[in-house]
Amino acid sequence: MPRTKRVYSGKTITGVLYPVAICMLFVAINVKLSQPEQQEQSKVVYGLFHSYDTADSGTITLYLIGFLILTTSLGVFCYQMKFYKAIKVYVLANSIGILLVYSVFHFQRIAEAQSIPVSVPTFFFLILQFGGLGITCLHWKSHRRLHQFYLIMLAGLTAIFILNILPDWTVWMALTAISFWDIVAVLTPCGPLKMLVETANRRGDDKFPAILYNSSSYVNEVDSPDTTRSNSTPLTEFNNSSSSRLLESDSLLRPPVIPRQIREVREVEGTIRLGMGDFVFYSLMLGNTVQTCPLPTVVACFVSNLVGLTITLPIVTLSQTALPALPFPLAIAAIFYFSSHIALTPFTDLCTSQLILI
């Protein structure tokens, strides 16, 4: 029985890098448009905290991690018990809340910040068209490109929503804690995400396209056995009867040769599925960098996220198993962020003040 090995081409890898880059750029542009420098708006952590002391950052992070662990565990439990309708209702409610409700406040803030004159009926008509089409594309049949576009919009708006309600340093603490939780949830034997992947592979179903970004919606066909030559097939056939008798006589003198089992490995083009949470946290980190740092640091974090994701994908090819997509990109982005914030930004400021052109 040939063993199947999934390989990932450059086209498949870029099929994931492009949407991640688009999502991060969408968040960065929207953060700049909604919060111009001359109008800095205060953030409010709804229902939890009303001050931004450093001591509160750890408490907020614990609340977020607890909520994430609870929702992930409940989602995996519902999936294993086949409570598909409950999961679909939860995902549908989140999509409506982000694409229809929150988008009203977000785009209203952009219109006010940029002094864009829009009438109320026109504004609500555009939001209804945007959100209604998005919900239809995410939860029912639609064109593949349109479905992928609204997955990116959903992740980007979710990242902006989280960014607007969290203090700056709390974002970094939350991202660090979420990265460790991602490792535990995916790699440990009792991790909920590992159990989810194993259950989905065992059932062979993909019932929730609204929470997974698929690099391709097409299934590549495996080559038929006729096109693959087995190594045990003889290259020469003897038709001469004397040769046949000679072989038969020799076989009486020699012990029978036990054929060695040769295991064929068939390479199949695989598709990469990235959770929408990964899109959200990549964009959350970049959006926080846009708020607090100059352009060189933003560019460094943007590139480092893509580099970290590019490092993760070959490891997936070698291990042939699901891996957490957050630790490598966020670790490299954190290194670039702090090194750029400590060394590069003061250096460029000094060169600018001294009129030194490099």
Swiss-Prot record:
A motif (PAL) lies at residues 324-326. GO terms for cellular component: endoplasmic reticulum membrane; gamma-secretase complex; Golgi membrane. InterPro entries: Peptidase_A22A (IPR001108), Preselin/SPP (IPR006639), Presenilin_C (IPR042524). GO terms for molecular function: aspartic endopeptidase activity, intramembrane cleaving; endopeptidase activity. Residues 221-242 are annotated as: Disordered. Residues 1-12, 79-86, 137-148, 192-273, 319-321, 343-358 are cytoplasmic. It holds the Pfam family Presenilin. GO terms for biological process: amyloid-beta formation; calcium ion homeostasis; membrane protein ectodomain proteolysis; Notch signaling pathway; positive regulation of germ cell proliferation; protein processing. The chain crosses the membrane at residues 13-33, 58-78, 87-107, 116-136, 149-169, 171-191, 274-294, 298-318. Residues 322-342 dip into the membrane without crossing it. Residues 34-57, 108-115, 170, 295-297 are lumenal. Residues 221-240 have a biased composition (Polar residues). Keywords: Endoplasmic reticulum, Golgi apparatus, Membrane, Notch signaling pathway, Transmembrane, Transmembrane helix. The keyword Iron does not apply. The keyword Transmembrane helix applies. Probable catalytic subunit of the gamma-secretase complex, an endoprotease complex that catalyzes the intramembrane cleavage of integral membrane proteins such as Notch receptors (lin-12 or glp-1). Probably works redundantly of lin-12, which provides more presenilin function. The PAL motif is required for normal active site conformation. Homodimer. Component of the gamma-secretase complex, a complex probably composed of the presenilin homodimer (sel-12, hop-1 or spe-4), nicastrin (aph-2), aph-1 and pen-2. Belongs to the peptidase A22A family. This is Presenilin hop-1.
